[in-house]
Design a protein with these regions (language model features):
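Extracellular/oxidizing-compartment recognition motifs
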Residues: 1-211, 237-240, 257-261, 291, ...
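Aromatic-rich carbohydrate-recognition surfaces in CAZymes
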Residues: 131-161, 186-190, 198-203, 215-365
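Intrinsically disordered, low-complexity segments enriched in Ser/Pro/Gly/Ala and basic residues
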Residues: 155, 378-379
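Single conserved hydrophobic/aromatic residue that forms the stacking wall/gate
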Residues: 367-378
Length: 379
């Protein structure tokens, strides 16, 4: 039932969408129906030098059903749907009868412009789905192989308003672990905002930087958000899965990417790579789960040997860009007036972090290895 378009790539603003052709919709998924189809042979592809582990945490599941706040017509056969709040997930739309072959376009965005008109998420981005009418009565579109982060939907090519619009908030099926309420409504709102934000970011077994632009599991974001997420949610299995992805991505020489999954050379620095250490330690502190330490301690040591190779007179210096990693950042969000690109600033921040990593490794060694072995490592 899928049309001629692909589903995009894993590059910023290029995640694409789905083109569903109602004319190809199957009446059912029984063996008899499926056997009548002309199936394309399965292709086996060998990708050398890449480790890929199965996702070892809860799957993504629908967590909340969201109804639109408003549906209004903004042009000839054009409708604007306001879901009332942002969400990361799927949309389902029921259309009145469409002519066979008629195309309906759905575009997604987080915001409106100053005139409260639809503002594209990115001028050259791909954030849209298409539905092609079957001409057979009531038509229904629902995402199956892609997802979007949005609050607003612009529907074009529809003479009448959609009969029904439903949003599905989706995230990894981790459980709630916190509650908070006080007499200050602002603090209550901040707590609710942070908690809901994570529901849109913790997706597919790791935490993304943004669910629309990049969908990348940056180690820097992981470090910055770890304590908050692990306080709010029971996420030990999410971090186990995420740390396994870091192990899969470490190179033979001990070099680490700045994010996992690692589809292209993304930006970062030591604070990003060292998440394998700090994330494992924080998971132990929050959940008492020592499995990450036991499993990934050798990976941490391997990376620190890579750090040592670029250490001069006791201080880490810039390592080179590679085909899997770019830039060399220190404080990515420095206060106004601080030149975060200055090498002195980058070196200061990076070496402070490495110092913290080494201190943490000493604590990890108390848990993971015997005292004689630990003393031998220290000496």
């Amino acid at each position: 039932m899928y049309g001629e378009t692909g589903t995009g790539t894993w590059y910023p603003h290029q995640f694409g969408g789905e083109c569903v052709d109602g004319r190809k919709a199957l009446p059912d998924l029984t063996t008899a129906t499926l056997d009548k189809l002309d199936w394309t042979p399965v292709l086996e592809v060998e990708v050398p030098g890449i480790e890929v582990s199965p996702q070892m945490c809860e799957p993504n599941r629908i967590q909340e059903i969201i109804r639109p706040k408003e549906i209004k017509q903004i042009g000839d056969s054009i409708w604007l749907v306001d879901m009332g709040k942002a969400l990361n997930g799927w949309v389902e739309l029921s259309f009145p009868k469409l002519p066979e072959g008629h195309r309906v376009r759905m575009e997604y965005t987080d915001w409106l412009n100053e005139n409260e008109d639809f503002k594209p998420q990115e001028e050259n981005g791909q954030y849209e789905d298409w539905y092609i009418g079957s001409g057979q009565g009531k038509e229904v579109f629902r995402n199956k192989f892609n997802h979007h982060a949005f609050q607003y939907i612009r529907i074009s090519g529809l003479a009448k308003a959609p009969e029904e619009v439903t949003g599905y908030l989706i995230h990894t099926d981790y459980k709630d672990a916190s509650s908070f309420e006080c007499s200050d409504p602002d603090l209550n709102a901040i707590y609710a905002m942070i908690k809901y934000t994570f529901k849109n970011l913790a997706f597919s077994g790791y935490i993304v930087d943004c669910p629309h632009y990049e969908r990348m599991g940056y180690g820097g974001d992981g470090n910055a958000s770890c304590k908050s997420f692990q306080t709010l949610y029971e996420g030990s299995s999410v971090y186990m899965n995420w740390m396994q992805m870091w192990q899969d991505c470490i190179r033979e020489d001990g070099g680490m990417p700045h994010c996992v999954p690692n589809p292209y050379p993304a930006g970062g620095g030591p604070y990003w790579c060292g998440f394998i250490i700090t994330g494992s330690w924080q998971t132990y502190l929050n959940y008492g789960d020592s499995r990450l330490i036991e499993r990934y301690y050798p990976v941490m040591r391997h990376w620190l040997r890579y750090v040592d190779a670029y250490t001069v007179a006791g201080l880490l210096k810039r390592w080179p860009d590679t085909d899997y990693r770019a830039w060399y950042l220190g404080d990515w969000l420095a206060p106004a007036g601080v030149d975060y690109t200055a090498q002195s600033s980058v070196d200061l921040v990076s070496n402070c972090f490495i110092s913290d990593c080494l201190t943490t490794m000493e604590k990890l060694s108390l848990i993971h290895i015997s005292e004689p072995t630990r003393q031998a490592e220290i000496s």
